[in-house]
């Protein structure tokens, strides 16, 4: 699951993950609706909600489908995991560039190109007859993964500062709904054929593109200075190098290392659980779709309801410890489960842990960042999350292929419990007064 922005935001409403910032093209000269200054901000937010909802449905629909489809083409567990790794890697490398283009050219063309790329990537998936074609489709999808960051910029453009949190909550609500609807839709469409979900999402993405084309105005402020070549060069520097340059103190380094632990472990679950339950229990794409839809429901309810109540009674460090223990125990227990039905219980435990720990941990991290570096360091936490999504699947796939089907989940659980031990040992450094 994606990273939540912090406990304070979670008390309001579930906030969106940070994602790619966005592509654009001067060649896209379609007549735009009226400028943002004359546009109704609420109407723009409705379009953004629909755009992000369909975009996340397209992302999450693949969770129960792609691993089994790739395996049917002869892919090994490592090759299946590589499909997720390539997507995350392409997103990590190109997101800053699309962000630069978004600031220079505008939000609308960036979103349109991103959505068109989504249609193309799903059509490539639908016609794929080899693992090489699957790789190409996932690299394309990662390259064009620009909608979320640009949507955040649109919300910033059309809302006042005092309404910003509610505006961002629109993206969070779309994300949560998409993570529930996507796996369920993928599982249901798979009953019509293994490729039916790809065609279905391509149609949805095309409808999404038509909606944005006709209803989304340009929102980039007219007086906003365009970034120059230096900003582009900086964007082209790989994120890990910028990350190393930004970390000067042990406290920040510890936080970022723990972010890496959290998202590496969870990425193993997303990447490989479909193969595991399919091989051991004969679970179908529909079965796995329902499982992940259930996990999405529990995650959303945890962050929208339970977290608010727990935050009144427990401090952030206690919430982090509880969440890490739940995730670690739930992941490590997966290989011991005797039947597929038990995965719904374990999935709920993992989702509750994730929904509690990530916002609380992000909130602690934000308090550790000095005001003048908060934006960059919060962005670097997202980079560590994406790096975890790159490393986790490929390492988990190697463990599944070389050791046993359950080995990746034992390792992921151990990694989460190691993060808990490190957090408790370093609590005096990590949990300190706000700077």
Residue ranges and their predicted role:
Residues 171-214:
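Helix-loop-helix hairpin linking two adjacent transmembrane segments in secondary transporters
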Residues 95-106, 302-315, 400:
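Helix-to-loop junctions at the C-terminal end of transmembrane segments
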Residues 137-176:
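Cytoplasmic helix-loop-helix junction between adjacent transmembrane helices
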Residues 64-77, 271-287:
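Short amphipathic helix-loop junctions that connect adjacent transmembrane helices
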Residues 74, 106, 127-132, 282, ...:
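Helix-breaking motifs and short loop linkers at transmembrane-helix boundaries and internal kinks
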Residues 92-129:
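Conserved MFS/SLC helix-loop-helix module at the cytosolic interface between two early adjacent transmembrane helices
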Residues 31-41, 217-256:
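Juxtamembrane intracellular "pre-TM" segments in multi-pass secondary transporters
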Residues 317-361:
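C-terminal transmembrane helical hairpin of 12-TM major facilitator-type secondary transporters
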């Amino acid at each position: 699951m994606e990273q939540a922005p912090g406990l304070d935001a979670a008390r309001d409403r579930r906030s969106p993950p940070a994602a790619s910032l966005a592509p654009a093209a001067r060649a896209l000269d379609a007549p735009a609706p009226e400028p943002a200054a004359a546009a109704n901000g609420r109407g723009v937010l409705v379009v953004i909600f629909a755009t992000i909802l369909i975009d996340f449905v397209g992302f999450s629909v693949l969770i129960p489908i792609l691993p089994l489809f790739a395996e049917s083409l002869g892919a090994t567990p490592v090759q299946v995991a590589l499909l997720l790794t390539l997507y995350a890697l392409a997103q990590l490398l190109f997101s800053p560039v699309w962000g630069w283009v978004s600031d220079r050219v505008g939000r609308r063309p960036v979103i349109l190109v991103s959505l068109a790329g989504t249609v193309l990537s799903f059509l490539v998936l639908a016609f794929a007859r080899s693992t090489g074609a699957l790789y190409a489709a996932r690299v394309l999808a990662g390259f064009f993964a620009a909608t979320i960051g640009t949507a955040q910029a649109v919300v910033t453009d059309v809302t006042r500062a005092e309404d910003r949190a509610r505006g961002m909550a629109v993206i969070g609500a779309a994300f949560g709904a998409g993570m529930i609807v996507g796996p369920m839709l993928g599982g249901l469409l798979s009953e019509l054929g293994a490729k039916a979900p790809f065609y279905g999402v391509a149609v949805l993405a095309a409808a999404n593109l038509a909606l944005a084309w006709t209803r989304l105005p340009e929102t980039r402020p007219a007086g906003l200075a365009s970034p120059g070549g230096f900003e582009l060069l900086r964007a082209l520097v790989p994120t890990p190098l910028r990350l190393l340059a930004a970390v000067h103190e042990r406290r920040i380094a510890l936080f970022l290392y723990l972010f890496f632990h959290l998202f590496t472990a969870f990425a193993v679950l997303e990447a490989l659980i479909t193969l595991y339950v399919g091989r051991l229990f004969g679970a179908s794409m529909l079965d796995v779709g329902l499982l992940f839809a259930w996990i999405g429901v529990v995650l959303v309810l945890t962050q929208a309801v339970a977290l608010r109540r727990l935050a009144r009674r427990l401090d952030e460090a206690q919430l982090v410890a509880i969440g890490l223990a739940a995730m670690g125990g739930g992941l490590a227990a997966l290989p011991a489960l005797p039947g597929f039905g038990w995965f719904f219980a374990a999935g709920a435990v993992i989702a509750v842990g994730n929904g509690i720990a990530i916002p609380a941990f992000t909130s602690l991290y934000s308090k550790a960042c000095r005001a003048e570096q908060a934006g960059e360091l919060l962005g670097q936490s997202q980079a560590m999350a994406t790096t975890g999504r790159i490393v986790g699947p490929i390492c988990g796939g190697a463990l599944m292929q070389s050791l046993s089907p359950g080995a990746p989940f034992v390792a992921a659980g151990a990694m989460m419990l190691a993060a808990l031990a490190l957090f408790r040992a370093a609590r005096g450094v990590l949990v300190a007064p706000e700077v």
